[in-house]
UniProtKB/Swiss-Prot annotation:
Keywords: Kelch repeat, Repeat. SMART domains: FBOX. Residues 14-60 form the F-box domain. InterPro entries: F-box-like_dom_sf, F-box/kelch-repeat_ARATH, F-box_dom, Kelch-typ_b-propeller. CDD domains: F-box_AtAFR-like (cd22152). Kelch repeats lie at residues 131-177, 178-224, 228-274. This is Putative F-box/kelch-repeat protein At4g39760. Signal peptide: none annotated. It comes from Arabidopsis thaliana (Mouse-ear cress).
Amino acid sequence: MISQEEVPQSTNHSLSFSSLPHEIVVSCLARVSGSYYPKLCLVSKQFRSIILSNEIYKARSHLGTKENRLFVWLKLPTRSYPSWFALWIKPNETLTNDGPIKKQSTGNLLVPLPCSYNYQVLVPSVIVGSETYIVGGYDDALSSSVWFYKNGKIHTLSKSPSMSVARIDAVVVGQYPNIYVMGGCDSDESMNWGEVFNIKTQTWEPLPDPGPEVRGQLVRKMKMQKKNVYVSSEKKDYIYDTEERTWKVTEAVFNFSWCVIEKVRYIYYNKNCWWLDTKSKDWRKIKGLDFLNKFRETDRIEIVNLDGKLVMIWDRFTLSKRNKKIWCAMIALEKCQGCEGIWGKIEWIGDVLMVPLSYSFLDCMVISI
């Protein structure tokens, strides 16, 4: 028989994350949805440091817990360089009312990202063939570098010859064997504001000077069709003819936004959202979205595919007209029963960030991190 004196006495210990090994804390945080990260950053300096590091993304990739996130690229008058913002969505956010849609305070926000996010996730890149080329970065030591992944494998990261000038937030587009890089440097760089990299010869060549008007504006987007590079800046759109090596102003070539969801192509154009009927080759209007008109004051609207749902982003004036607010709506798409139409069902709508009147909306994208 065991006496009472021999019975081990349990002791209550107060355990905390700070007492755990660092790698265990990283592993735990990597398993948590990114929707909770804004509040977790407020828990402790340790949590904030891990969440804002590249370490957490390596762990999420290893554990298979990566999520699709929406990033927005803005130019604010108070900052020297454009800034990336991430859309933080409250977990299980959805409208519960079945009545008329009204403006609601969703709690969803566009949160500015520190440079550590920018460098690790959002550096300019382009896919050419089986290789992904990463151009520049947010570190002075890397801002003139070009790296590439062979066959999509990170462990085969290699370095190509450096650009003529360092670039931060450059815009790139590629069509084998060339990669075109523009902007991201001082506007006085007339000789090297734009460069082209030849993959075959592994050499850089400067592009003709487009002039101070082009160099003085931020490049929002670029796309390439056949021999032409289409460049969209803050105020105008331009065409660079790669064969003639000439620049010219063109009509707006980015006057609509598009995305693909479950093999269906969607565009926002002429104040409406449309989908392409591949059988008839006709563009058809998405039904059920007329209510959005009262929330919009601009023709400039971006749409993206976020986990199979249509996300719309735009801006509008505040009541005082002294600022603007960026708005966002998440829409679930449903095919009509017994017909060939598509309905849009709002899940939430609200303003996510206040910005100065003089800001510029540059771009948005969805990235798996």
